[in-house]
């Protein structure tokens, strides 16, 4: 950020999420830092993503294990800690995925959390079902990386998509599944763009 810095903010409790704020420097005043700001809706999106993971903790735990098995099966890897440090924060994220959504679609969830930050997982599940009963407004973007230099055939990502459709007890969402070359562009904190992909929905 010009005349400022992008600061990564991590929350561990009562919900887990990662986001960023821009802190502007007051260049005309000594030893002062300006007000922190964020892109519109970014923090709210991160909070709702963290609430979704809290509401469906068992399903996300299963997703973590399932993604690990898929990576082993197809000789792929996820984000390393170093890569996660380089990437732009996406709210709730794991080694193989990040959760993305329009928080305005989940106002019952968001407002209930603001009213009661200790809201239970059971209550959250009921609210998510109220706002989005099929999970069609929720996206869990799966990202895998190859170990070598050459992308596999499209068939590999299609097979992963088929495996997802056969797997029970995963969080409801749309699942865009992408396999990238194993390279993160430091300048923008994103994969280098070369990829193969598929998309499925779990309702």
Predicted regions and their residues:
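Long, charge-patterned amphipathic interaction tracts in eukaryotic proteins
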Residues: 34, 38-68
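A short, surface-exposed beta-strand/turn
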Residues: 17-43, 170-172
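Amphipathic N-proximal alpha-helical interface segments
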Residues: 18-30, 112, 118-136, 186-203
């Amino acid at each position: 950020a010009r005349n400022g810095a992008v600061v990564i903010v991590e929350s561990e409790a009562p919900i887990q999420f990662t986001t960023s704020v821009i802190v502007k420097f007051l260049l005309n005043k000594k030893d002062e830092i300006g007000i922190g700001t964020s892109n519109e809706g970014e923090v709210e999106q991160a909070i709702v993503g963290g609430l979704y993971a809290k509401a469906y903790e068992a399903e996300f735990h299963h997703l973590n294990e399932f993604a690990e098995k898929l990576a082993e099966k197809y000789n792929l890897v996820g984000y390393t800690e170093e890569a996660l440090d380089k990437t732009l924060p996406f709210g709730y994220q794991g080694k193989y995925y990040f959760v993305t959504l329009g928080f305005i679609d989940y106002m019952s969830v968001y407002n209930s959390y603001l009213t009661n930050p200790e809201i239970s997982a059971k209550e959250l599940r009921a609210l998510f079902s109220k706002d989005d009963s099929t999970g069609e407004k929720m996206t869990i973007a799966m990202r895998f990386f190859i170990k070598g230099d050459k992308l596999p055939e499209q068939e590999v990502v299609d097979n992963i998509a088929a495996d997802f459709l056969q797997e029970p007890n995963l969080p409801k969402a749309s699942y865009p599944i992408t396999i990238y070359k194993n390279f993160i562009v430091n300048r923008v904190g994103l994969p280098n763009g070369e990829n193969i992909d598929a998309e499925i929905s779990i309702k």
